[in-house]
Amino acid sequence: GQNIYPDRQMLLFAQDVLARVPGGTIVFDVKCSQRLAPAIRAAGGVALMYKTGHSLIKAKMRELDAPLGGEMSGHIFFKERWFGFDDGSYAGARLLEILSRAPNAAAVLEALPDSFSTPELNVACAEGEPHRLVAELQALADFAAPAQVNTIDGLRVDWPDGFGLIRASNTTPVLVLRFEGQTAAALARIEAELLALLRR
């Protein structure tokens, strides 16, 4: 078997919710897979990447009247047919509902687009250092096209074949890193580029 991480589960939840709420905005955090936004748009929704933090995602959902939001950490918020707060048991029930409609539940999960990715990596720092380091990295970031830089929450750099993220944790003095590539080689290249920037 394999772990189906929450950002991949969000692909299923978004498709399901958007079938009933066409054009809805789906909010997700900067740690989520690069494959999520295109899947949301393909299902007729609006994809909005936002800052990590369950209270921040929930507030943005309220602001935009979004029917669904989620984080890579596993906080999933359903406003469509529910109350808009994160509820693990309810998210599990919604996943079972989706799988129960398919003749082969395993095939539904196997069909989800996959990538090569790291889990969330934490680098311990002195108190106050993570935010200072991230501000320096944002100032140093100078990536050539086709790279796209996003500084809404740390430094996320997207390439056509993957992304890298360095951000400061909201709760502890650590840098949070995550890397994803569509191939193992892309993952290694992206990780090397971001770590080289971090070592400057």
Regions found by a protein language model. Name each.
Residues 1-10, 36-37:
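Short Gly/Thr/Asp-enriched flexible loops that form oxyanion-binding sites at enzyme active sites
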